[in-house]
Amino acid sequence: MIPRAPLVLLLTLLFPTLRAEVRVERVLLPEGATPGSFAVALPGGVNFCYDPARGGLSYVWTGGFLDLAPARPGPGKFIAPARLLGPVVHREEGPAPLRRGQPAPAPALTFTGYTLRPAAIEFRYTLDGVPVREELSARPDGRGLERRFVPAGGGDARWWHITEGRPPAALGRDAAGALILEVSWEGAP
């Protein structure tokens, strides 16, 4: 009988989308990611690069997570970006994509931390001094992300999601008052 730890490692290598927990790496990432960006793997094979300097997704990829060998080559070796183990399926650009009140100008953003959840990750930051919690989780079908924004103030304000090259999108609220943004990609239902 194979001991549990090697069996889990073997299954993860053979079937990278079978992850049952959230995984976070903070390494040099490809595809134009800024230094300090987070690579996050969600259960079901949905992975993304989150830029804490701009408070938003940089890109999403599906399938396997990361090949970390180039980013952690050992002493005296050249460090290169980690390799994505799947295709990039969604990109977002532009500063501070979450906006309060008016779509312009970009607010002052300060990243304050993150918390791992059973099947999600929650990032915390302030926008013009207003504390915001943003929870990202994979859709059950694995073909998109759900982003839940919970601002501590400004409940009466209109909130926007701004991405370069797209028109501003007003965010709606769920029954609990959280702002909801569904992110899907080409071929997703």
Where are these regions (language model features)?
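Short, well-ordered beta-strand segments enriched in hydrophobic/aromatic residues
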Residues: 145-153
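Beta-strand-rich N-terminal accessory domains
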Residues: 20-146, 159-161, 167, 172, ...
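Bacterial N-terminal signal peptides
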Residues: 6-16
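Positively charged n-region of N-terminal signal peptides that target proteins for export
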Residues: 1-5
